[in-house]
Amino acid sequence: MKRFVPYLGIVAAAYFFTLAVAFVNESSVQQTPTKVPTASSTVSIVPSYTVPSITLPNLKEAESPVKETLPPKKVTAPTKNTVSAPVPAAASVPVSTPVSVPVSNAALDASASTLRSALVNIICYAPLGSGFHSISGSGIFIDPKGIILTNAHIAQYFLLADRNVTCTIRSGSPAIDKYGAKPIYIPPAWLYANAKVLTQSTPNGTGQYDFALIAVSKSADRNPLPDSFPSIPLAISPPTSGTPVIIASYGAQFLASSQVLSFLTPTIVFGSIKEIFTFVKNTVDVLAFGGSAAAQEGSSGGGVANAFGELVGTITTSTIEGPTDTRSLTAITASYIRAEYATETGEAIDLLLGQPTSISISNFAQRIPELEAIITAQLN
């Protein structure tokens, strides 16, 4: 069975500095009915605000592709438009792997500190009348040269500079403007499969191909760029079920647009991997977690780290209704990202990470016009 659920978003009118918190919803790709975790993870949560309780919908109703409607926060009433989700290859059953051994709390604490330092908030502003929404999401520095891993549905906005879309990289608590950035890789497969997502109020997807790389290109103020950025390395091997992890993001579902701009703080969660899934074959492609404060709009592009200080996953999907401790959060694995990048480019991702960012930015800039055309064709 293929299960498609919506990208998370907080959308407001551009006149009010609109923000749509872009974040893909929970998608477990499997042949059997989707199993949605209802119990909270065994976690210690450090939320940045009180999470309100809202009614949890029946998430197990569908036995076929699901089209759940995302109710974004808008100045105008939300619509019920949906977008065709990417069609992955036939999905297989959950992958069976051994349960990982316990690790020390000290190691988890150290990894949490590293992950939090590497966490960024990404905000892109779309002009009024542009036909698409402003967004707020998360990202993680994975290289000290200033390379950020995030989602493709966030990074696509960096293709729209010639349409007066501006993006800024923020960090800190609360998050403040720090850097400008430019894209250095967005999977064409995601753009082709999600060409209409840009203009949809309630798009949905699976999380497949939903990763991208952007690189810091300038400072947001007059301060010089640092010689090195705090970062966490991209893991090579996938984790196992039961592995303790740390999840970090700039969740913003319960904040008004003005609060996102002025009072957005990180959410850090200690938990464990509940299940693992594959998109196509017996590879560990998707990590599933129980509910937590990280399961909310704005967490898209956030990071999942293990106790060894490695980034093992990037948040892509989640359910978004009900108390956060009853939701389901998923991430694509670092090993999936590595494999998919190699499949699309014929090269290891480490080659891209190893070259100067100025070269990566220049090389990718040559492709921006053709990639932009894919996602803006419906506007012309």
What residue spans do the PLM features occupy?
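N-terminal activation segment of mature serine protease catalytic domains
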Residues: A39-P144, N151-A152, Y209-A212, P356-N380
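Extracytoplasmic
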Residues: T114-L119, F132-G137, D143-K145, L149, ...
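Active-site region of chymotrypsin-like
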Residues: L115-F132, S217-S231, A256-A348
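Solvent-exposed coil/turn segments that connect beta secondary-structure elements
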Residues: Y125-P127, P144-I147, N151-A155, R170-A175, ...
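Catalytic-histidine neighborhood of serine endopeptidases
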Residues: D143-T206
